[in-house]
Amino acid sequence: MNLLTYSLLSLSTLFTSTLALPTASQSTPLPPSQDPFYTAPANFSSSAPGTVLRFRIAPGNLTSIIPNCSIAYNIVYRTTNSLYLPSFAVTTLLVPSTPNSSALLSYQIPYNTASVDASPSYTLYTDGPGYPDIPAALGLGWLVNIPDFEGPLASFAAGVEEGHAVLDSIRAVLSLSKQIGFSPSVPYAMWGYSGGSIASEFAAELQVQYAPEMNFAGMAIGGLPVQSLDILTAASGGFFAGLVPSSLLGITAQYPDARNYLISRLKPSGPFNATGFLRAEHFSYADAQTYYENQTIWNYFLNGSSDVLDAPVIQKIIHRDCIMGYHGVPQMPMLVYQAVADELAPIVNTDELVNRYCGVGANILYQRNTIGGHLAEYTNGDEGALEWLEAVLGGTYEGKYKGEGCTVQNVAINVTSSPV
């Protein structure tokens, strides 16, 4: 361990050890852009990644919105952005109603937005009932960590930023074990679908180099957009069209030159103009889906899709920040599940990613569902993912699943009426 690493870890330990259990905060949650809590203190960059910077009981009534939750905390922590510069993020920790929390699940919500005010720590108050996996995990006695992994700039689809933020959220939560009252050696795992799989998968890749001290029990991910170009080319003109402006604004949020270029290529007038495109900066995923549905997003650009897909300044970001499989080999057991007919995230790219990982020793159960599409698989794959996570977090994985190497299964699971 070098002197710089030792100094950062010492500062981190000192800061966390002086944190007292917080009292109740304000009664009404504020949007992150209006809440002073969503800031980092001066000189925070000298602390180690994962250091807790602020800590509070979540405002409002999350415990009455989310079943099986006894208390909720908001945690601001130090992390690292896609440029490998110090940054910060916020996570929400839900504590189960049952005593003696037995495991920690980091649940990456696919919030898919270029607006910081649509981050989970705020939208859980309105959207929480739409995520039944959360009370299910709490009902099993698990702590549930829900990070705002896009960070303070809402860098949607920026995988490196998102992966760092997930890893550091778990570091932050584990450092508070004494204050909150759970074992620091609790087993922990990740779960994410679609946009949540981006953050989870990048965290798994980056863990080897960025957080080598961490030892995950496992990771379940589904609906993987292995390459951002998958979203950009597949979504425009259809149901998911809102993902295109949101992801382009998200991946350029940390790159001012790229953002300025993107804006410069938007049409100044007409039915598809810059004002309409930039509305996505303030839209939640649901708002963007409603506003842009069936629009050909390339109509907003002076020269159509070539202004984006052929632009070196955009391509550089995509290759640096938005393609899975190039930052390390995940070391934990993995469940990967995807619909063969996924219209948003082509399964051929997931096949290739899994094959690459399996070729270098990864432990993966890969389930290819022959029924349904992207939305349907969110539900179709859910029960199996939770069962798999119960095994890895409950210590029964080796007895139920293959502990080494890879298993590829073509399955036919249909528990939803969704046609896509």
Residue ranges and their predicted role:
Residues N2-A20:
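Cleavable N-terminal signal peptides of Sec/SRP-targeted secreted and luminal proteins
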Residues F15-N100, V420:
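Catalytic-loop region of hydrolases
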Residues N81-A137, D148-E150:
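Short, surface-exposed "cap/lid" segments of acyl-processing enzymes
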Residues P132-D133, F156-Q179:
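Alpha/beta-hydrolase active-site loop
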Residues R171-L243:
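Primarily recognizes the serine-hydrolase "nucleophile elbow" in alpha/beta-hydrolase
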Residues G222-H327:
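Accessory cap/linker subdomain of secreted extracellular hydrolases
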Residues S306, D310, Q315-I318, L344, ...:
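C-terminal catalytic histidine-bearing segment of alpha/beta-hydrolase fold enzymes
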Residues P330, L335-D342:
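Short beta-strand/loop motif that positions the catalytic acidic residue
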